[in-house]
C-alpha cells in the first residue's frame, strides 16, 4: 500500500521525504500555509476507487489520522510549530501540534484524495536545516472496494 503526501490534487507531485520551507530569521514570514493531499494513486492508476482504507485498529470505527512527529523534542523545531486542519479556516482555531482526524475511511485514486491544510509558524531564529519534524498517518487496513 502506497499512501503518500502530494502537493497537487491530481497526485502527480509527491512531497517526498521532506517539504522544503525557507524561513526568515526575524520570523517576518510567519505563518506559512500549505495545502496537501493524502492519497494512493500508484495502485489505482485508473482512479476508480478500487481500494478502501480504514484504521487497522478498529476498521470503520476509529479515525484515520495524520500526526506530527518530532524526533528530537526540546531541540530545534517543535511539533507545536505546525497546525493541521481540514480547511484553511481551521488553521486559526485548531490546536498546534495536534493530530488531524480525516474520517473513518477513504477510497483510493486521485479524485478521492483527502486534502488537508498545514500551517508552519517558525519559532527558531538560527540559520539551520532541520529534519526533525514529520507527518505520518496511522496504520491502515486496505481492502478491495465492493
What are these regions (language model features)?
Residues 3-5, 36-38, 64-68, 118, ...:
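Hydrophobic beta-strand residues in large extracellular and virion-surface proteins
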Residues 40-42, 120-124, 137-143:
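Beta-strand elements of well-folded, non-transmembrane domains
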Residues 2-45, 49-56:
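Beta-sheet-dominated interaction scaffolds and their linkers
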Residues 21, 52-53, 102, 133-137, ...:
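Generic detector of low-complexity/intrinsically disordered segments
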Residues 15-17, 27-35, 112-116, 125-135:
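Short, solvent-exposed loop/turn segments enriched in Ser/Thr/Gly
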Residues 6, 42-114:
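Surface-exposed binding patches on compact interaction domains or structured appendages
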Residues 15-23, 98-104, 119-120:
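Short structured motifs
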